[in-house]
Swiss-Prot record:
DNA binds at R339, R344. GO terms for biological process: DNA recombination; DNA repair. Homohexamer. Forms an RuvA(8)-RuvB(12)-Holliday junction (HJ) complex. HJ DNA is sandwiched between 2 RuvA tetramers; dsDNA enters through RuvA and exits via RuvB. An RuvB hexamer assembles on each DNA strand where it exits the tetramer. Each RuvB hexamer is contacted by two RuvA subunits (via domain III) on 2 adjacent RuvB subunits; this complex drives branch migration. In the full resolvosome a probable DNA-RuvA(4)-RuvB(12)-RuvC(2) complex forms which resolves the HJ. This is Holliday junction branch migration complex subunit RuvB. SMART domains: AAA. It comes from Trichormus variabilis (strain ATCC 29413 / PCC 7937).
Amino acid sequence: MAIISSKKQPPEPNGQPNKRPESAPAAPKEKVLQPEAAIDEQGKQEESIRPQKFADYIGQKDLKDVLDIAIKAAKSRGEVLDHLLLYGPPGLGKTTMAMILASEMGVNYKITSAPALERPRDIVGLLVNLKPGDILFIDEIHRLSRMTEEILYPAMEDYRLDITVGKGSSARIRSIPLSKFTLVGATTRVGALTSPLRDRFGLIQKLRFYEVDELSQIVLRSAQLLQTQVTDDGATEIARRSRGTPRIANRLLKRVRDYAQVKSCTEVSQNIAAEALQLFQVDPCGLDWTDRRMLSVIIEQFNGGPVGLETIAAATGEDTQTIEEVYEPYLMQIGYLSRTPRGRTATKAAYKHMGFTPPNEQLSLL
């Protein structure tokens, strides 16, 4: 329930040391593997490569099938699409999917994020201005304040906004009807959502990491839109190093394009892509300096682990949330890192990739 004053307010402003490889990880040059959207990717060029319909959206077949059924059913009944919660690692296309839903339903959409909805009037202003069928996309929805969540409860269930006008004995509750809308929430931490909020979503879907062949198609499509010549092998080379994430694939493509242009290359071949990505310290498995530093700390300083998250964060200079949400999921997916109740451990594959020999006790377990 929102509390709104009737007075107008002014605007606010351990074991034996292992043999070290010949070359230790160098200091990072640029974080080209961070899946968070960069400033230069918020302009027209980013929008130009973003798919506008399901036919152009590569990958996530299971998700597209589920949403296609939901859209067709809602259209046939003349109803709005049910509220949808999308969760998964950053950069997999949650925002893009919300835009495609609006396009497929033939409605408008509004995009915001939970940290921007600090005060009740922030979310109230969005809700009262929604038109019938509109889609409201809230990114990082797990970071909503308790008061904002409580405003959303009746809005999601009954399309109603309950507000308290005035204070003290003169206060009164007023219900404002809202247009029927669809709330699409996105989060990287679905477990952080409160049960009352999570249970109000009719559809809860997970986005998975992409396969190399899917990312190759994304790279080729983006290259065509960016008017850049990329060979199939060049696209595959970029895709292999993109950590299963389309946003990273598109970012690496732009960096490789810059490299090819400066080197006067007419097209991006596999060799050119490999040379460019080596310059940016992205290895053939998609690991960057922070990934290698994490594995190096676990292997060299703690004999393979287990190591606590806070210790890894201190050694790499990253915060614990970034490590948990950005780096660990991919390292676990490719089998380089394991999470145990006692901490993080490096796997045999990680030892091999980093150029170390696993200790005997770990070899017996693997």
